[in-house]
């Protein structure tokens, strides 16, 4: 688990946080037009930022699950395309994680392609091969005389497992809270867009008090049209609509919408 500290301008009254995950660049069923549109939105929206949360590349190999013959281009070309696509928003990337599709190259050859993407984009210090806790600060508390920024903690990882059923995927998402205390939890991998909230009593040692807080949980979608491996294995068609997180810079408030 890596800690990443991000401080954004205090002038921001709110931010949009977009997650790019399970894009599967190189797969014949990747909706590249939709990906380009989402990247363009982040680039053109001053208060929009993003996380790259694994499986950016399809990265099928001869010895992995998947079909190398259904890929539009090879893994090296996939890496180059990913860097070209995300270059316009490289300054808006707050974290990059490692997915199971990128892990194919690591298991066989020790090559960490997700790190290479982060390095080429100039955000290697924001890369993690496992998970990350992001300490995000921006804005200014309304009416506060000490210029205090709003602070949010985000626990993010690509994820694993989850099964085929929606309930199992929801449990996988909720279980993130048993690992670390955070305001927001972001999970990908299971291709099911999902948003939920839970209450929690957070202790404060300095004041010897407990405060009731709300935690936000987000599971992201896959950017794939139906077909190929998913159809052959009888997986359900998935929605490509993925949650966007909205954070308030004047008070502690967080929501997500599909």
Place the predicted regions along the sequence by residue.
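Core catalytic region of metal-dependent phosphoesterases/phosphodiesterases
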Residues: 4-128
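Beta-strand-turn-beta hairpins that frame and shape the catalytic cleft
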Residues: 6-18, 135-154, 212-215
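Short, flexible, glycine/charge-rich loop motifs used to bind or transfer phosphoryl groups or to couple energy/partner
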Residues: 6-8, 40, 84, 144-145, ...
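Short helix-terminating capping/connector loops at secondary-structure junctions
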Residues: 44-46, 91, 148-149, 210-213
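Charged, low-complexity C-terminal accessory regions
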Residues: 93-96, 103-195
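Conserved beta-sheet core of the metallophosphoesterase superfamily
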Residues: 153-255
């Amino acid at each position: 688990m890596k800690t990443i500290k991000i401080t954004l301008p205090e002038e921001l009254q709110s931010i949009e946080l977009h997650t790019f995950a399970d894009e599967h660049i190189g797969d014949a069923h990747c909706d590249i037009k939709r990906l380009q549109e989402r990247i363009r939105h982040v680039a053109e929206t001053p208060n929009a930022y993003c996380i790259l949360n694994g499986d950016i590349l399809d990265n099928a190999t001869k010895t992995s699950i998947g079909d190398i013959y259904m890929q539009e281009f090879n893994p090296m070309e996939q890496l180059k395309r990913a860097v070209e696509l995300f270059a316009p928003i490289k300054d808006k990337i707050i974290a990059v994680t490692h997915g199971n599709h990128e892990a194919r190259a690591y298991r066989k050859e020790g090559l960490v392609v997700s790190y290479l993407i982060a390095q080429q984009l100039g955000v290697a210090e924001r890369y993690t091969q496992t998970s990350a806790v992001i300490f995000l600060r921006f804005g200014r508390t309304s009416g506060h005389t000490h210029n205090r920024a709003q602070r949010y903690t985000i626990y993010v990882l690509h994820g694993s497992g989850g099964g085929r059923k929606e309930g199992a995927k929801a449990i996988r998402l909720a279980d993130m809270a048993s690992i670390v205390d955070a305001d927001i939890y972001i999970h990908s991998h299971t291709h099911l867009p999902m948003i939920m909230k839970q209450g929690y009593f957070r202790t404060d040692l300095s004041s010897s008090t407990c405060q009731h807080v709300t935690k936000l949980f987000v599971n992201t979608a896959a950017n794939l049209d139906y077909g190929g491996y998913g159809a052959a294995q009888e997986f359900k068609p998935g929605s490509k609509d993925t949650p966007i997180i909205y954070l308030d810079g004047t008070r502690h408030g967080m929501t997500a919408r599909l």
